[in-house]
Amino acid sequence: MIQINKLRKVYDNGHEALKSINLEMNEGELVCLLGPSGCGKTTILNLLAGLLDPTSGDIKFNDISVIDKHPKDRNIGLVFQNYALYPHMTVLENVMFPLTVGNKKMPKSEAMEIAKKYMKITSIEELANKKPGQMSGGQQQRVAITRALVQNPKILLLDEPLSNLDARLRLKIREEIRRLVKEIGITTIFVTHDQEEALSISDRIVLMNEGVVQQFDIPQNLYLEPTNLFVAQFMGNPIINIFEMNKEDNILKGEHFDIDLNLLLKDRFKSELTEEKYIVGIRPEYFITSENHLFKTKIETVELIGKDCIVNFNVNGVYAKSITDVNQNIRENDEVGFDIDYNGIYLFQENGVRVY
């Protein structure tokens, strides 16, 4: 178990990278730290690894504080974006290396036996005699992960390990990472800025922005039940459609369409709607083409994404997107009528707090 309590990090230039972070991660759990550049996710990873010292707060592994422990004494495995393999060594020698130096040094024969065991688990046995320059990026990544695991760490820390790989290989390797860490049962923290990676690989996701945890939840809840406007806008591709509307009695009025509040589910309201203005969020898949439409508009561009299309249109100066079936054969400059599936509506106060 990893416990992070009131963790702050302020750099010498006064920048507060982390603002009193509180997190608890369970043993054997795969947790992604997700967010835009500069949000603090890598800072947390470096603090967990002992590569940075916190300004205040505490970090505990299994109820024992590690704040004052050297990185080598924290029993962690760390894999960076750059694989950091020794170019003059073979794969077997690279994997064995952590077992032949420092306080974990053991006889060469024993180190080789352990290395081969983990190389079998990660399916890199056939690469044993190759050097890094003779391998693909995906193969090098497997070697780097194996080298981290061979030390039998309690915690595995992965810092954007897939960012140097092409899209198809990223998909393959992330599946392998998920399988591997679950097979071994190791607690894993995975840093990424890619929401698709986080959604597909995680047990839970920590979504961060400006040094603050915005939501710590299971993947589907970040998409379906965002806590605030930032989460709703960050999660989802295409991005959620946003409209500013005015409340008049039980109607939210917009330029091209209105939202009847009486049609919303009462148990989804998180507070009473007492303000005059609200931000309405509608996921693209909930803008549906319909003859009995709320509004009609001209399609500006169409993006083909396999069996679906992303159609882009303008709602009185606000650009919006809908996902439609490619067989609808919608083309640029077509006049198309849209309705709204109320299951895909979210309401936010102007400060970003979600109220529905």
Locations of the language-model features?
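Short coil-to-beta microelement around the adenine-binding A-loop and adjacent beta1/P-loop entry
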Residues: 14-16
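The feature captures the beta-strand-to-loop junction immediately N-terminal to the Walker
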Residues: 34-36
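Helix-to-loop junction immediately C-terminal to a conserved catalytic motif
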Residues: 49
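Conserved ABC transporter NBD signature motif
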Residues: 57-65
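ABC ATPase nucleotide-binding domains
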Residues: 74-77, 81, 85-230
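Non-catalytic connector elements of ABC transporters
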Residues: 240, 251-356
